[in-house]
Each structure stands twice: as structure tokens, then as C-alpha cells.
């Protein structure tokens, strides 16, 4: 919001310097983004008079001018403007002047051999227009010219300062000069001199269709006024032009400019339709009942005031006349119904549209205007019709116009319910004020002064005050805590002492949080990088997903059911970026069930794809992606560090994984997840290398097991003092038989003397038979206190051999 200081001073008494005022507003929540001194645009520019103009001797398009600037001697200036001539009063930039609008410093010099000691300026060079056809003719801009040599800034309206403030979403009142004036008055205690408004003007009922009436009342209010006797060709008076220029709004004509001035002053957007153009557009007589409000039809054509041709979508809301769209509700009017130089009658629209509907409409066409920015934040219903009367009064100052009627659909009265502000709640939350005399609770008189300064109505109660917020703040001051915040803001947050709870309890991580942190550290130590993927994904025909009600994009319209799909996409992006590999993991949540009963699952998922990001000197410069066992070993390292005994069980029915290189991971006798090489068909479809490995674990179960009591307590054992006895055992089993199952049977049968068992060899060949394989194990036996003899070892070893034969149908080879 650009705030003109001179306009602000007409609404409220300002005694602070502009810097002090900006600081006050920033501390109160309206952050100052820029302070622009408009006089800097014309610093060093004075009023001059062209006494004589001659053609340049060496250039057809240049003129040599003798300019009187009130000094004893005239100065010579070479000018290239077509409209320069003798007898004109012009703005003259003296040597040394800086023109920030065009980033130019004026210097003495020669143009085609003729000296020039200054520059005659155009309005664009002074920052008063986007483009200019020639130099500024001061005679046409004002009837009272300053003395020659006087600064030109005051007569051009550049004797002002503009504050640019950042307005937060909860303060729509800050998007109006009246709102800023009220804020300044509340902060400084200064008196207000606001325009007097007619809050409840006489009006008739707008007889709209049932559908339109429902849409209008859903938004809040719709008013339309017929005004005759305006002149669309008339240029706005200087004060209107200056207010618009300082606010950064382009001038159009006197009618449109007045609607924009009212919007800047009161915060209520207005729109003027050309009454005759509407009748020509629709081919029918137009009255108040001709106007309507509906959703756009898919593909409906619309040309806005900016000339853009739009194809509307059904979620956009349009204002209609005889069912033809004439405006995007709350955003922009149509070009065909806009005010032109031929306009003599207008329909003036003053409405309150639904913030959500305006936001949806603006987003659907990719257009955000000054009007839509205000509607989106919410407006007070009480001010809607009053602003149309305010615009009518300003139009009457310019034209001999007359209102033929005001028609309204909806109730202009708003619910002015009170909010109870409890004295104890205010003191408990804010604490005492600290000053040189000590600390004390905020006095009732100060609280009442703050709330009254905002325009609130107060009535005392046993507990404190019943507060009715002013219309402009009713959306913001809806709860007790909002009122307490306002009091603190106006008094000054820095004046309240700190009163933190005492004593402060030290924070600590839960065992589950510690386990997750350790998991992250261990995986990073194993060479993997943690990532975080978006939990919102697109719809899938093959994988039912829970839809969200208000998606921003179709690609983020559903909750994810897995992590691995996005992980593969991350790998693809990294490999396309010429990375040698992508080793990643994530601790994330997936969602299943329905919108009424969402089931959340915590997963640990990851992918090992390609080479680890290390130097190749260890592999003689050759690529060395991990094989199945190397990749599985990374996961084993992490599980062993957490003291978790995870075993593998053959997995063949997971369509994502290679049927011969996949395993179900088992923890404490129950499946924990899976690990395996990506299925060749899936890897090829994703353009991933064949040696891509995927793992997915139940994070909740993993953390539960890792946080069991004494799980991380180191168990110290004495070094063995007696030798071990080792025996090798080779058996022929089915080719599909997992070594882990055999080893589990060996451990169970070899108790208590068996200390360790290791797979040392696996062999397949025709001599063993079809679908047969030989697996060899090394068994280590040891007693805690004595050396074992063959007579002690052999019975246990025979027990192991018999268990393999009985449980797995093994054929003994040794």
C-alpha cells in the first residue's frame, strides 16, 4: 500500500517526521518497505521560459533554444522535442541535476557542435508518466505559473512523500487511506478528520433471478446505481490525478478515476459500466433486474479491460447483464462495457463478493488486481453502499449528474456481536508494564483508551468489558485474544516485562526419537543420503489413493501410499544429471484406507543405485557398482549397530523385485520388510541400471525393537581362555533352499556348545542332480571353561547333521 503523506495529513493530524511515523507503523505491524521523497524526482529542475527557438545548424531534428530561468542571462539548451517553441513555460533541469526516473545526471556539453547547458524535461523524465510525446508544457498544466527559476516540484505535485507499507492478510483495513489514518490516530492520539459517509442510503430491492440472488447473498451484498449526466471524455482534476499517481494507479478518465480514488480512500472497490454500451451489447433495454451473478460456463469467451482475450472455466464467477458476462466478479470488468469518452450514463456497481470466490476467479485467469486484492482479504458489509454514495458525491463535484436509483440485493446490516474482554485474562497474558517507577498492571483507563482509539464501542461488565469492534476491524477482532493483542500492540510490546514460566523444565528426546536419530546417522555413515519427498502425489488407476479436498495441482491431489515410487524418480533425476549413483533413504509416512478412516504407516525406505560417490582410485578408475551382497551388507551394518538380529527369508512374489534376488527381512520372528534388486522390467521402464536395490522396512516395529530395555547397553564378555574346535559340514539341498534357514537349524541343534556357524561355499553342478546345490558351513564349538575332546564334540555335530536331514531333506556330503 502506497500512502501519500499529504493525503494522510488531510485525514489525521500528523506531527511526527516521516521517519518516525514509518517506525511507529512498522512496530505496530505495518512494515515500512520504502520511503520515497517525490521531490527527488525534480531536484534541480526549475521553471523556465523559452524566449527564442532556432533550427540547429547541423541537425534537422534538433532545436537551439534560449531559455530564461530568472537569472541575468538566458541559458542555451539544445532540444530534440517536436513541440518545443518560443513562448512556452517548461521544466528545465539545470547542470548537475539528477533525474532518477531516467537515471540521468545533467552535464554541460555540445550536441552537433552547439553547446547545451541543461535539459528541457518531459513528464516521463520527471517520473510523472510512463511515456511522453514531447516536453512538458507548463502553461497547459496550470493556470497559475510560479516565478521563473522557482522549483517546479510543487506545481507538479512532487512536494510529497510516499510511504510504501506491507499489509498483512489479517488487516484489510490497511489497504485504505482511512484505515491507515485510524491506525495513526490510535498510535499517536491525534484527531481524525474523515469524510462523512451515508451509512444507510435509501434503496430499492434488486429483483434478480433466484439463482443470481442466491449467489449475491452468498457473497454478502450487491448494489447497483444508475447515474446520468457524466462525461467520459473529461479529464480528472489535478488533485485526483496526483492521488492516483502517488498510489501507483494509472489515470483513465474522470469517471473511472473517481471510483479508484474511493477505493484508495475507503478500501471498497467500485466498478462503472457504460449504460448505453450495455444496451448495445445485449440488444435489450437494461434495468437493475438485468444484472446477475453466476458461475462462468466452460470455455465462455471474455475480453477484459486490459484487452486480454480469456477462455473462462466453470469455477470463475461472472457478473452478467441479460446473462452476458460483463465482469469477472471482484477482479475486472469487460472491455465492451467499460467507460469511454462517449459515456454519458453509468451503472455504478458496489458489491461485497465472497473472498474465496474472488480468489478462485482471479487464480483461474491468472490475474490479480487492486480490487481482487481487497476482496480476497474481506471487506466490511456496512461500508459497501456508503462508498457508492461517496463516489456519487465526488462525481457531482465534477459533473451535473444525478442518481436515478440504487438497487440492492442482500442485507447491508452486519452482525455487531460483542466480545468479552476479561481483565484477569489481559493481565495474565501480558503481564505488568515496566518503567522507571517499577512495574504495574495496565490501568483500565489505558485499555479503554486503546480500544476506543480503534473505533470500538465499550460497555463495562463485572469481568471487564464487552467490546463491539468497528466494521473495518470486525473480521480481525473476533476473539478475546485478538483484543488483548491490539492493546499490547498500541501500548507497545517492548513496554511489557518478560515473564517466562519458572522453573524451565529441560527438554529431552524420547527413546523413539533417539532411535530415529541414530538410524539417520548410521545410514549416512553407510554412504546413503537422507531425502524428504512430498507426501502429495497424483491419482493412480492401479493404486487407490485418498484424495484431498482442495488440491493446488492435479499432480498433488492425493496422499501417497508408498515411498519407493518417488525414490526411483529421484534416482532417475540424479542419473540424468550425470551423477555416478544415487544412494538415498527416507523416514516417511504413507496413507491408506479412505478419507473417513485414514491409516498412517511409518516406513523406512531407500534405494541403492549406481556407484557410491567416492573417488575411483580404489578400483583403478573403473566403475564399481555394488552387487546384491554388498548392498545388503550396508543394511546389515545399520541393523547390527542397533543390536538387531535381522535374518533373510526368500521372497518371490513381490512384482517390484527380482524373483531370485529378493528377501523378506525377519525381525523377532515376524516380517519387518523387504530388500532386493529391482525387477529388470521395472528398471528398464525407469531407465535405471540393472544393479538397483530397493529396501522398505516397517519403521514403527523397527523402532520398537531398537528401544527395548537394555538394547543399547554394551554386553562385555571375557576373552576365551580355551581353544575352539572347528568342523566343516557340506550338504546337498534343493537349489531354492536358503542358507539362512539351514543356519538357523544348525544353531538350534548345536546348543550349547556351538559358538558360531558361517557359510563358506556354495556349489551347483550337473553331478549334484537337477535343481540341487551344495552348501558348506564351518561350525565352531567351544566350552566356556575346558578344552573339548572329539568325544564331546562328535555327538553334538551328529545332532546337527541329523537335524538338517530331518528338517530339510539334506543329503550329507561330509
From Swiss-Prot:
Binding, Mg(2+): 476, 482, 485-486
InterPro entries documented for this protein: aa-tRNA-synth_II/BPL/LPL, B3/B4_tRNA-bd, DNA-bd_dom_put_sf, Fdx_antiC-bd, Fdx_antiC-bd_sf, NA-bd_OB-fold, Phe-tRNA-ligase_IIc_bsu, Phe-tRNA-ligase_IIc_bsu_bact
EC number(s) recorded for this UniProt protein: 6.1.1.20
Entry-linked HAMAP family: Phe_tRNA_synth_beta1
NCBIfam families xref list: pheT_bact, YtpR
Keyword check for Membrane: no
Co-factor(s): Mg(2+)
GO (cellular component) term, any one: phenylalanine-tRNA ligase complex
The protein's name in its UniProt record: Phenylalanine--tRNA ligase beta subunit
GO molecular function, one term: ATP binding
Domain B5: 414-498
Broad EC category: ligase
